[in-house]
């Protein structure tokens, strides 16, 4: 459960940063949340944070009419798949 919470926190922070700097590239946004990622000891959580953030950003890029809440819901709905891909299953 804590893995999921940490992933959602990272995605939320990334979306907040994107709202402040709408022209920021994905790399800049990931760099912004890098401190959150580095705080984690579990490699799967770190990878999950990166994958989930990229999924949320890609979702918003492909669906510009959607808002951050919808992107976060999209990530949450796909969290089992994200965690599985992060753990290499």
Regions found by a protein language model. Name each.
Residues 1-89:
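Intrinsic-disorder/low-complexity detector
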């Amino acid at each position: 459960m804590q893995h999921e919470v940490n992933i959602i926190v990272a995605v939320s922070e990334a979306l907040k940063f994107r709202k402040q700097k709408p022209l920021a590239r994905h790399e800049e946004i990931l760099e912004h949340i890098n401190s959150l990622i580095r705080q984690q000891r579990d490699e799967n959580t770190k990878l999950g944070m990166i994958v989930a953030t990229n999924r949320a950003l890609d979702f918003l890029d492909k669906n510009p009419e959607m808002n951050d809440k919808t992107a976060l819901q999209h990530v949450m709905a796909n969290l089992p798949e994200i965690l599985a891909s992060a753990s290499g299953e």
